[in-house]
């Protein structure tokens, strides 16, 4: 089954709608899971979209060092994705809400992730590589849920984020603890200012620039004009 998961707080719900529309228009999937803080999603959505209500403090102490970071608590919750999704789901594509899908993602479900926790695109911009020679951007991740559950690494990720401050939430946890079992994803599946640019991006990632209305990038027009007024396929 082709499944995708997004996570976010209430202020991000409108961006989730745009992200999901772009996904279903350009690369239809069987199921979309929304990890959110409400019982129901407040916008009309297709039947393939299922909400999972999660208390932001389910896995993380409100006084943990990462609760005051620049991102919402759901940037930590994503470290526990494998604990929240159905046990019979063997892999899932985890997407940030500030992503727009522009082309088919079928290649990602065909990736061989045997023995790997995830596949993602490395960052190339800057010298921020605190955990080794490579640093992955985790805004687009194909998660191998079978391997994650088998090893129990999600428990280690949660413990790490509850005890050690990191600037980028679950992304730092994965780069610290899971990098030895990571596969490299082609850059066209996570085109961002920190990963690189291609002529035919499949996923455009704003990478934190969530104020799209004031973002002067060329991709702002795609969001505003193409998906804001688009209907569900």
Where would I find each of the regions flagged by the language model?
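A short, conserved beta-to-alpha structural element at the edge of catalytic cores
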Residues: 118-135, 216-220, 230-233
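Short, polar loop motifs at secondary-structure junctions
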Residues: 36-41, 124, 188-191
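Short, acidic, metal-binding catalytic loop of nucleotide-sugar glycosyltransferases
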Residues: 22-29
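A glycosyltransferase accessory/donor-loop signature
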Residues: 1-8, 18, 138, 143-233
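Short internal beta-strands
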Residues: 32-37, 120
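Active-site-proximal specificity loops/subdomain of glycosyltransferases
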Residues: 41-84
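GT-A fold catalytic core of metal-dependent nucleotide-sugar glycosyltransferases
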Residues: 53, 74-125, 133-135, 141-143
């Amino acid at each position: 089954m082709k499944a995708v998961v997004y996570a976010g707080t209430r202020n991000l719900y409108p961006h989730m709608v745009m992200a999901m529309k772009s996904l279903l228009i350009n690369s239809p999937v069987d199921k979309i899971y929304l990890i959110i803080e409400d019982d129901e999603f407040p916008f009309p959505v297709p039947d393939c979209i299922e909400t999972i209500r999660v208390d932001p403090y389910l896995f993380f102490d409100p006084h943990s060092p990462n609760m005051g970071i620049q991102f919402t608590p759901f940037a930590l919750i994503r470290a526990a994705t494998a604990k929240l999704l159905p046990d019979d789901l063997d892999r899932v594509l985890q997407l940030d809400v500030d992503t727009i899908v522009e082309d088919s993602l079928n290649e990602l479900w065909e990736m061989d992730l045997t023995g790997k926790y995830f596949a993602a695109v490395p960052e190339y911009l800057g010298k921020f590589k605190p955990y080794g020679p490579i640093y992955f951007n985790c805004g687009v991740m194909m998660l191998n849920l079978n391997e994650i559950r088998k090893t129990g690494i999600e428990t280690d990720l949660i413990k790490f984020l509850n005890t050690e401050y990191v600037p980028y939430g679950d992304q730092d946890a994965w780069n610290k603890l899971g990098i030895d079992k990571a596969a490299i994803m082609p850059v066209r599946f996570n085109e961002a200012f920190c990963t690189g640019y291609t002529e035919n991006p499949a996923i455009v990632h704003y990478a934190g620039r969530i104020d799209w209305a004031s973002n002067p990038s060329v991709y702002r027009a795609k969001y505003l004009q193409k998906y804001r007024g688009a209907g569900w396929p």
